[in-house]
Regions:
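Metallo-beta-lactamase
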Residues: 1-111, 146-216, 235-242, 294-316, 320-322, ...
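Cap/insert and terminal regions of metallo-dependent hydrolase folds
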Residues: 2-19, 109, 117, 143-152, ...
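Active-site metal-binding motif and surrounding structural segment of the metallo-beta-lactamase
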Residues: 93-146, 161, 232-238
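Divalent metal-coordination and catalytic microenvironments
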Residues: 74, 84, 122, 129, ...
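Catalytic core of the metallo-beta-lactamase
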Residues: 72-77, 172-234, 251, 255-259
Length: 358
């Protein structure tokens, strides 16, 4: 399907729009952001070295490794799926300017147990990194799925034949059912192609009953309730919590931690993990540690009554049946200094079962 073949109230003559957000950002808004606010200082580098490689798991379990920012390796249905992989030092078209990484990816790309499917939510540089995509293609040559209008970018990385989906469309790829779901955001890789390609998230469903939701980028909007109604058994949701400051500029495009908890509740997910924070300096104005602190304060009350999971000291505890990520939206958690250990995320749970979930 090409962009011209798409339909729905998110379509325009030139591309796409947000049906629930009529506002548009102009150069004047960018000027106001850059000239009237002062970004919080971030540390130049955090010593958070890559962790040992996770094993490849058989079907019947869901496992997730947080690479950093919005990059994840998810194992579901016996398949290894990469979401929005970015291993580059900058989330930028330029190697010498733009948002810069302050901590290493949580895993070396070459140490991953595989990649059977590649999912790219939208075309922003902190989600679609062509050097990383080229490396993924050279090593595994996986099939790729993305939103309408984005396959041309993936082709530049050698990933030809990527499957493009409109919102709510699905495809059977690599033995999994992949549904592209709505998000409230925008797209652009240059000043001239804003909203010419589609943005969104993904729901993965495996034959063994496991269901994983990846939000991509989104502001708070009615889509979370809609996704929860269409997919009432989401085992694991990956939800952004950072890049929300200043609010006058980011509010409709990026959720803050309190809104992320609202999204967790609206989705009805059994577990949710916070993402999109603490990795690239220059992407946002908030302090590096603030998303975690605000998330800790905002977690659902009912979850805090549960016996909290211990923090994950290292990815060596991979086989644990508990969810050790300290950024759980739905359970008590631990927060280290400057997000310490935030890239050492380990989750291993039974698909469509209660072990390690409750």
């Amino acid at each position: 399907m090409t962009p011209a073949q798409g339909s729905g109230d998110h379509r325009t003559a030139e591309g796409f729009r947000n049906p629930h957000d009529p506002t548009t950002r102009t150069l004047r808004d960018v000027w106001r952001w850059r000239r009237t606010t002062t970004p919080a200082p971030w540390p130049p580098w955090i010593d958070d070295p890559p962790q040992p490689a996770p094993p490849r798991l058989a079907a019947g379990r869901i496992a997730v490794t947080f690479i950093g920012h919005a990059s994840f390796l998810v194992q579901v249905g016996g398949r290894c799926v990469l979401f929005d992989p970015v291993w580059s030092m900058r989330a930028s078209p330029l190697s010498f300017a733009g948002p810069k990484r302050v901590r290493a990816p949580g895993q070396r790309l070459e140490d991953l147990p595989g990649c059977d499917l590649l999912l790219v939510s939208h075309n922003h540089y902190d989600h679609m990194d062509l050097p990383t995509l080229r490396a993924v293609r050279r090593r595994w040559a996986p099939p790729a799925v993305t939103g309408l209008g984005n396959a041309r970018h993936l082709a530049k990385a050698g990933l030809r034949g990527a499957r493009e989906l409109d919102w709510w469309q699905h495809a059977e790829v690599a033995g999994l059912r992949v549904t592209y779901v709505p998000a409230q955001h925008f797209s652009a890789r240059t000043p001239w192609d804003r909203n010419r390609s589609l943005w969104g998230g993904f729901v993965l469903e495996s034959p063994d009953g496991g269901t994983v939701y990846f939000a991509g980028d989104s502001g708070w909007c009615p889509y979370f309730e809609q996704i929860g109604r269409r997919f009432p058994r989401i085992d694991l949701a990956l939800i952004p919590i950072g890049a929300y400051a200043p609010r006058f500029f980011m509010r409709t495009q990026h959720m803050d931690p309190e809104e992320a908890v609202m999204a967790h509740r609206a989705l009805g997910a059994r577990r949710s993990i916070g993402m999109h924070f603490g990795t690239f300096a220059g992407l946002t104005d908030e302090p590096i540690e603030e998303p975690e602190a605000r998330l800790t304060a905002a977690r659902p009350t009912r979850a805090c009554r549960r016996r909290p999971s211990p923090p994950c000291p290292s990815a060596r505890r991979w086989r644990s049946r508990r969810l050790f990520e300290q950024l759980l939206l739905g359970e008590g958690a631990h927060r280290g200094p400057h997000g310490g250990g935030a890239h050492r995320v380990v989750a291993d749970m039974r698909a469509a079962g209660d072990a390690g979930i409750g």
